[in-house]
Amino acid sequence: MATTPVQPPVSNSPPVTSPPPPLNNATSPATPPPVTSPLPPSAPPPNRAPPPPPPVTTSPPPVANGAPPPPLPKPPESSSPPPQPVIPSPPPSTSPPPQPVIPSPPPSASPPPALVPPLPSSPPPPASVPPPRPSPSPPILVRSPPPSVRPIQSPPPPPSDRPTQSPPPPSPPSPPSERPTQSPPSPPSERPTQSPPPPSPPSPPSDRPSQSPPPPPEDTKPQPPRRSPNSPPPTFSSPPRSPPEILVPGSNNPSQNNPTLRPPLDAPNSTNNSGIGTGAVVGISVAVALVVFTLFGIFVWCLRKREKRLSAVSGGDVTPSPMSSTARSDSAFFRMQSSAPVGASKRSGSYQSQSGGLGNSKALFSYEELVKATNGFSQENLLGEGGFGCVYKGILPDGRVVAVKQLKIGGGQGDREFKAEVETLSRIHHRHLVSIVGHCISGDRRLLIYDYVSNNDLYFHLHGEKSVLDWATRVKIAAGAARGLAYLHEDCHPRIIHRDIKSSNILLEDNFDARVSDFGLARLALDCNTHITTRVIGTFGYMAPEYASSGKLTEKSDVFSFGVVLLELITGRKPVDTSQPLGDESLVEWARPLISHAIETEEFDSLADPKLGGNYVESEMFRMIEAAGACVRHLATKRPRMGQIVRAFESLAAEDLTNGMRLGESEVFNSAQQSAEIRLFRRMAFGSQNYSTDFFSHSSYNSRDANV
């Protein structure tokens, strides 16, 4: 009697608690015993098992020949659709492929514990024997250590009906894996089955051995199997968290049903890792390029800064002219000639010139060079001698004329301190100041180098045998010296107190512009002789009275000394004249009562220099006497600042701004409407004729109103 085998439906739902119904009393020819997996049946494991990295496939259980069981009842889960029964077909043509790994629904949706779904049917009895009592076959689970966080469950493939009497087909080999993958054995049956089981699908390669499908994951939802008698079921991929390879059956022929391996899920990860590596390499390359460009920019910036520093010393081109000298002068007769900056070098204990920068310039000179330039510091080259040392005229190898000052400060001060102080002073530049352009340190010797000034100093022109200075020149010299001192006191950083203002330290240009020299030398002497408390800084006749009582020099001390210089310009007398009668040797003490009388009566003949012959401007003489009287006051707090003295001299020149016209006697000429040149300028400057016309008209009306 022929039987029509019916393939049981595949269930991807959790285990069914109710036993399957009894099988039909159909008989089938005897078949060899089923081929089972090597593992013996094992008891059901606990509900939860750690998920393996790949989905695990199990060998299907044997089914009865010719006695297909009826379809199982509908699973209780609502999330999984019920399996559809397979229409029976002739045994030779029916070869259902093994079912791929299918995730099962979460345990929350199934009332029984989350286990691998049991086999759809229990093993049927032999032919012509009533089916045994229905009993649910226990599910077979094989545990496997999970590599991922969430568990993955893969149900076993459905049983297939093979009523043929041929021996069972061989099972296709499994892909290679690090450890053998064990398939769960078929469930035990009371009676042996007589139909060969279908080939068990191979398990995918995995890093760890997969022994059984674990309990269902929490977030995985089951998908309904698509069963077809002649086509293999679709392959479902495991959850994204696991990295297994998924088997895809090739055809419905068991002998040619070689599984197709999909690439593992961690392939994208390797691609991402490769992409990340490439990005990191690109980022590192860009960073290295930026660092190289930054270093190159810093190098170029340093070179440009060095060039600017060297070129900052250069100035106007002034050709020195021959000069006459006197031993009475305490300063060199030099001037700034900045056509060539200076560089430096050191050799054999002394600083040697170093060609560099522009025009082989140098700021540090060797002692041998200065000896050669001054002809061995001969008396023929001596320009003057004062409290700080002797001044010699010298000619450098490049033809420049310089003044070399030998300081009498000894070697008490360290080289670093002296060099730092000189560098600070050499940075001071003003049109009414003489700056230091070089220095030399050789053992205990200290030398300063200035450019040569050709027109001597104020002391020489006032008290020498040359022609008499006219009044206008004297006013010009006084105003220039006041500006230079005001710069040192108020605008220079750090502020500098000269400490030795006198007529011999006011050098004159060829056009009689005044330039104050030797500023800062008193401080150098004090720094080098701090242990000497009896040294007197300054010159008798110029020193302020508070210095004699306290020994303290302040800015007001310089103001007092400048007042003495003003008295020299007014009277033509020396600060201390021993040829005068007793009690009149001091210029300040002699001039005090005369200053008060001249301010009250505006009679200046008693104070004015007889050499002038009365050729002076009375208003300027009055202003000059007034300024001198304020500077030589006894109390330092009553003396004006140098800035106030400068403004007093500027007011002398401000009187010429009116050009002989008085306020209110003139009318502003409106040239905006009558001069063609002004109209052209207006169009070029403003672009709009109406706007510029209103502007000029408004200014003209305001000027007229102000005059009225």
From Swiss-Prot:
EC class name: transferase
Q: In which tissues is it expressed?
A: Mostly expressed in roots, inflorescence bolts and flower buds.
Q: Name one GO biological process term.
A: cellular response to hypoxia
- Per UniProt, which keywords does this protein have? ATP-binding, Cell membrane, Glycoprotein, Kinase, Membrane, Nucleotide-binding, Serine/threonine-protein kinase, Transferase, Transmembrane, Transmembrane helix
**Residues in the Extracellular compartment per record:** 1-280
According to the UniProt entry, which residue ranges have a biased composition of type Polar residues? 250-260
Which subcellular locations apply to this protein?
Answer: Cell membrane
Coiled-coil residue spans: none
Annotated GO molecular function terms are: ATP binding; protein kinase binding; protein serine kinase activity; protein serine/threonine kinase activity
> Known catalysed reaction(s)?
L-seryl-[protein] + ATP = O-phospho-L-seryl-[protein] + ADP + H(+); L-threonyl-[protein] + ATP = O-phospho-L-threonyl-[protein] + ADP + H(+)
Cytoplasmic compartment residues: 302-708
Q: Give the highest taxon in the source lineage.
A: Eukaryota
Query: Where is it mostly found?
Result: membrane
Q: Where does ATP bind?
A: L383, G384, E385, G386, G387, F388, G389, C390, V391, K405
Q: Which residues cross the membrane?
A: 281-301
Glycan-bearing residues: N25, N269, N272
Pfam families attached to this UniProt entry: PK_Tyr_Ser-Thr (PF07714)
Sum up the protein's function in the record's words.
Could be involved in the negative regulation of root growth.
Q: Which family does it belong to?
A: Belongs to the protein kinase superfamily. Ser/Thr protein kinase family.
Q: What is this protein called?
A: Proline-rich receptor-like protein kinase PERK9
